[in-house]
Each structure stands twice: as structure tokens, then as C-alpha cells.
Amino acid sequence: MTHQLKSRDIIALGFMTFALFVGAGNIIFPPMVGLQAGEHVWTAAIGFLITAVGLPVLTVVALAKVGGGVDSLSTPIGKVAGLLLATVCYLAVGPLFATPRTATVSFEVGIAPLTGDSAMPLLIYSVVYFAIVILVSLYPGKLLDTVGNFLAPLKIIALVILSVAAIVWPAGPISNALDAYQNAAFSNGFVNGYLTMDTLGAMVFGIVIVNAARSRGVTEARLLTRYTVWAGLMAGVGLTLLYLALFRLGSDSATLVDQSANGAAILHAYVQHTFGGAGSFLLAALIFIACLVTAVGLTCACAEFFAQYIPLSYRTLVFILGGFSMVVSNLGLSHLIQISIPVLTAIYPPCIALVVLSFTRSWWHNSTRIIAPAMFISLLFGILDGIKASAFGDMLPAWSQRLPLAEQGLAWLMPTVVMVILAIIWDRAAGRQVTSSAH
């Protein structure tokens, strides 16, 4: 007999999914986009919500449909390419960007206002921070219970208070949009949504949500998909409400900070302005705990993944990943964001193509014929977009600037659509040939 979840269990699954997604990036990027977009904040918000909410939820649903992790999702592109994709996802949400970012965000919100942005305080902080991360990651047994029962609700309560405050007590009038947002607010919001890395995170952690439903006795594929979809939608609604409030917070904070300020600085300035020193201390403590929990979760997940393929023990990998993340974190938050933008701009398009096209797998004679070329083309043109967003943008040939949507950082979109159409024609033709030869 198939076990069905009670309403309480479904809500708990939704909260767990929301808590998995809400990390450092989710809190710092919406205020930054809000401040820079100014009067175009809601146009930018729509673009941001597509990549920072829509795509991660879609990824969770796609994983539930195939009943597994990123390895199941990437079946149409083959084992080697699938492993490469999984490795890129784990590196991005692990030691390259997301894990170091947890340290820099908690430092900038809690410590930098007291010490300034000099290198030595960050170095000392990062050594202590990652020593704790490594220690907890070596013995993660009780972490999940602690997170689920105490820290996740605390984090959600703090975010609700912050969101309500942003709406009820705006810091000042809306700022004027930066040049980048005057003509391309939607696409800038869309590309900035990449920076939350939630789609990559969903590929890594989506299986956790599916397994959480399984652990409660749900075995039927149809019900697993349904419950995971509900959990994803609940998390999506929560993220949307949080982001809209944080966009409002950022767009109203022009009188508090410079428009080039990063999200952590905006957040600290607003909380200091609205709640005073005690509020700032509470915010710093909560963000420290939230970031630490995220860092431990990412370190554990990455160590478990790489232990399957590298002849090193889990414990050794925890030390390596923690040490590497510590070194990277000393670049500082603003530099880390600058470096991550070109890389994420390059690797997001093939992930988007894979997730969206995974829903069409049953439509084709051979889904590999559609998905593999679409991902390849989206990666090629995504790399062009990535180079354009980097310091090497001037080295690109003139024709790359004339591609459709190139100005918006979405040069990959039209070539990928064209490739999908050509691949569909090929699949239909090749499929008919196979059938006729069989008879």
C-alpha cells in the first residue's frame, strides 16, 4: 500500500526546501539589484525571479520526474558529459564560489563595520570560520536535526521581520537607475539571478528533497513527483515574497549607501538605520549562523561527491575543500562576485537548456539528439556572454556584439532555439528511417 503524506509533512517538506535554497546569495543580491535598478526595479525583479525562483523550482520538479539526482537528469548527454556537468555544479556551489561567499557575507555584515575592509581582519576571520566549518563537517551527524528544528525556523522568522520592515519602514525615496538598467532592466535582472546559484544548487540538492519524501514512506513515482512539486512551489512562493521585499529594501536605500555598494553593505546600512546597534548585532549573529550552516552543508555534499571519484577519504577532502574555500574567501565579497559573474554567465545556459528540455524527453525518438546539441550550442554562446561580462570583453570580435540579444547578455538564447529546431527535424527524419528499416 502506498503511503501518502499528511498536510503537516508536506508543509515541513516545503519549509525544508525553502531553507535549503536560502543562503548568502539570496539575501545579498536582491537589495543590490534593487538599488542599482532604481525606478526600473520591478522590471528587473521579473527577470531576476525567472532565474532565481522559476528555474530552481523547475529543476526540482525535473529531478522529481526522473526520480533521481543530476546523474539521472543528464542521462541524454552521456555519462562522461553528465559527470562533467555534476563536477562543475559541485565546484561552483562548493569551494569556488558559494562556500567562500558564506564567509565573506557574514564578515561584511558582522565584522567589517567594526574593523573596516582591510585584508588582515578578513584573513583572521576566515581562518576561524573555516576551522569551525571543517570541525562540524567532520562530524555532521546531528547537524540536520539542529538545522531543521531550531536554526531554519529562526532564520525564517528573522527574514520575515526584515521583509516586513522593508515594506513598512522604507529608508528613503527610490534611487535613479544606473545606466546598465536604464535600457536593459529585465535582462540585467535575469543575468543577476544566476548569481544566487540556486539552479546549480537545486541540481546538487534536489535529490535531498526527493529522498526526504521517500524517507517518510512515499514510494510511488507519481506521488513523489507530486509532493516534490508542492514542496518546490511552496519554497518558490516563499522566495518570491522574500525577494520582492528585499528589492524594495534596496531601491529605497540610496540615501544610506553608494549605488556601487554590495548587498551585504546595503543590508547592514538598512538594519543599522532602522533597528540601531542591537538590530545590527542580531542580524550579524543570524547571518553568521545561516552562512555557517550553509557552508557545512556544501562542504559535506562536495566531500561526499568527490570521495566517489577521487582516491581520497571523506575526512581528507573536508580539509582540502575547507582550506581552499578559506583561501578563495580572502578575495573579498566584491571581487568574488566580479569573478563569479563571467563563469556563471557561461555555465548557466547549458543548465537552463537541460532543465527545460528534460520535460520534453518523451516527445522525441531519441532525446540525446535534441538535448546534447542544444546544450553544446548554449555552452559555446554562453562562453561568449561570459567573456563579454569579464575584463576580456574588448577582445571579442565585432560580430559577437551583433548577435541577437548580445547587448542583454543573452546571446546564447537564439542560437540555442535554432539548434533545437534543427535537432527536432533531424530526430523526426532519423526516427522515420529507423522505423522503416525495422519493417
Curated annotation (Swiss-Prot):
Q: Residues on the Periplasmic side?
A: 31-43, 101-118, 171-189, 248-277, 338, 391-404
The protein's matches in InterPro entries, at most eight in alphabetical order, are given as:
Brnchd-chn_aa_trnsp_Livcs
Q: Which residues form a coiled coil?
A: none
Q: Which UniProt keywords apply?
A: Amino-acid transport, Cell inner membrane, Cell membrane, Membrane, Transmembrane, Transmembrane helix, Transport
User: How is it placed in the membrane, per its record?
Assistant: Multi-pass membrane protein
Instruction: Locate the transmembrane regions by residue number.
Output: 10-30, 44-64, 80-100, 119-139, 150-170, 190-210, 227-247, 278-298, 317-337, 339-359, 370-390, 405-425
Q: Give Gene Ontology CC terms.
A: plasma membrane
| GO molecular function terms listed in the Swiss-Prot or TrEMBL record | L-isoleucine transmembrane transporter activity; L-leucine transmembrane transporter activity; L-valine transmembrane transporter activity
Listed GO biological process terms: isoleucine transport; L-leucine transport; valine transport
Enumerate the subcellular locations listed in this protein's record, separating them with semicolons.
Answer: Cell inner membrane
PANTHER family on file: BRANCHED-CHAIN AMINO ACID PERMEASE BRNQ, BRANCHED-CHAIN AMINO ACID TRANSPORT SYSTEM 2 CARRIER PROTEIN
What is the protein's known function?
Answer: Liv-II branched chain amino acid transport system, which transports leucine, valine and isoleucine.
Put simply, this protein is called Branched-chain amino acid permease BrnQ
Q: Which organism is it from?
A: Salmonella typhimurium (strain LT2 / SGSC1412 / ATCC 700720)
Q: What is the lineage of its organism?
A: Bacteria, Pseudomonadati, Pseudomonadota, Gammaproteobacteria, Enterobacterales
